[in-house]
Amino acid sequence: MSEKIDYYFSLISPWAYLGHATFMELAATNGLDVTFKPIFLQSVFDETGGLVLAKRHPARQNYRWFELQRWRDKRALPLTLKPRYFPCDPRLADKTVIALITAGHDPDAFIRAAFSAVWSEDRNIADPAVLAEMLAEMLDRAGYPSATILAAAAGPDAEAIYARNAEEAIAANVIGSPCYVRRGEVFWGQDRLDLLADAITSGRAPFSIL
């Protein structure tokens, strides 16, 4: 039976971007059953004591620059340290992932495109026109009307799932993006992917909260 992983993330998160390809490689190698769960980070932070970047102490903001550069080089990914459209409102983009899944599409190509849009291409994923362009490149050529996905992303069903994802994240002890949850054990941050891989390959029981 495939190992199940709940993957909590937001498309505005540089850490989710830096870890996404590595996580998907881990999933493919190990035959993981991944459930994509986009979340509105502000909702999770508000409930779990996290702070948006602008409200963090300068020392924490400064340390972030070191880590971004370290992991950019470690992952060998293009990364604009001060992207033109960061921060921006990620909600419509996040809900586009939900709309794709609901319509039966694999969201991975869109997720990768959206991450690249923010972190290497200086494009605004809060702009519906940018999202429409990305969707058209993926879906229209395959004969599926991309406008249908964007309309669904802006609709009440996607909003309800998005809100439920945040509620489930909080209940699961998720505190940021990305988080990978294996059988109740939370791995917070793309820098924990080696530990997740160890847990999966060893087949060990999940560690518990004492």
Each model region followed by its residue ranges:
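C-terminal cap of thioredoxin/glutaredoxin-like
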Residues: 3-6, 12-32, 102-105, 109, ...
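Structural alpha/beta surface segment adjacent to cysteine/selenocysteine redox centers
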Residues: 11, 17-118, 207
